[in-house]
Amino acid sequence: MRSDSLPTTICQERKKDPIEMFHSGQLVKVCAPMVRYSKLAFRTLVRKYSCDLCYTPMIIAADFVRSIKARDSEFTTNQGDCPLIVQFAANDARLLSDAALLVCPYANGIDINCGCPQRWAMADGYGACLINKPELVHDMVRQVRNRVESPRFSVSIKIRIHDDLARTIDLCRKAEATGVSWITVHGRTVEERHQPVHYDAIKMIKENVSIPIVANGDIRSLKEAENVWQMTGTDGVMVARGLLANPAMFAGYEETPLKCIWDWVDISLELGTPFMCFHQHLMYMMEKITSRQEKRVFNALSSTSAVLDYLTDHYGDESLSKSL
């Protein structure tokens, strides 16, 4: 767990409280937890383009607690990385609360992943299987609440919906009674992958609880984010793939601007982002602005220097691009 010598007192006195943000009446724009992708460098980038709140990738709480190596590789932050929510996959209340205690000096809160539909996660008792285990969710939330002393430290959950929406509403009401700070709702069932998002279900959930609700699913632009926010009456929207393709979307850009690409280069070089991650993000960002032939060439590059040469040759040097 690396925090770039971030003083605990500074971390605990973060000026932007996400709970207050959700009660502001303004659209709260959230970067989703994305395995391999929503790490410090990418969070730093989207914060430059009007993202209000960022999540870490999903972290296995048991591994995080038991392994220093896991902590060092899975969680890195710095003074500018706030407000920040650390998302954990957990199936044990004690281990989750242990993990929460480790990160509470460096984050605004934790989130329990109750929505991951991947088979391995559900087989291990993580993710979306928890929407059918409200008692376990209750125990995990209560244990974190009992052990983390800071009243400003948030505990949230991210869920998918049931086929029977009444069960989801019941789950959300129970979570609210337990002390959950807010709930992010991905508007699909566990079985659904690319079907249309059930925004009507998210709206109904919002109408049946008093805590903030965040809408998630198939949001690709700021206009779509605003439409979903108004349609559902929720307090915020969470975006994953839309931000991968265009980290500047919350600032109103329809496609990734060149300045954003060069910002990513600067941030990655400064933070020492591994090449594969650095390159993969650029492939997502440049999807709409490169031809098929250009993609073949760019995607085959195998070093940071080759990528920098390509960008300079095709889009001008950094200073020129930043003036566009």
UniProtKB/Swiss-Prot annotation:
EC code: 1.3.1.90
Keyword tRNA processing set for record: yes
Membrane-crossing segments per the record: none
Molecular function (Gene Ontology), one example: tRNA-dihydrouridine20b synthase activity
Essential cofactor(s): FMN
InterPro entries, alphabetized: Aldolase_TIM, DUS-like_FMN-bd, DUS_fam, tRNA_hU_synthase_CS
Residues binding FMN: 33-35, 87, 158, 186, 216-218, 240-241
GO biological process terms, semicolon-separated: tRNA dihydrouridine synthesis
Signal sequence segment: none
Keywords per UniProt: Flavoprotein, FMN, Oxidoreductase, tRNA processing
Domain of life of the native organism: Eukaryota
Reaction equations catalysed: 5,6-dihydrouridine(20a) in tRNA + NADP(+) = uridine(20a) in tRNA + NADPH + H(+); 5,6-dihydrouridine(20a) in tRNA + NAD(+) = uridine(20a) in tRNA + NADH + H(+); 5,6-dihydrouridine(20b) in tRNA + NAD(+) = uridine(20b) in tRNA + NADH + H(+); 5,6-dihydrouridine(20b) in tRNA + NADP(+) = uridine(20b) in tRNA + NADPH + H(+)
KW Cell inner membrane (keyword) present: no
Family annotation (PROSITE patterns): UPF0034
Residues at the catalytic site: 116 (proton donor)
SUPFAM superfamilies: FMN-linked oxidoreductases (SSF51395)
Record-stated family: Belongs to the Dus family. Dus4 subfamily.
UniProt function note: Catalyzes the synthesis of dihydrouridine, a modified base found in the D-loop of most tRNAs.
Protein name per UniProt: tRNA-dihydrouridine(20a/20b) synthase [NAD(P)+]-like
UniProt organism field: Mus musculus (Mouse)
Gene label: Dus4l
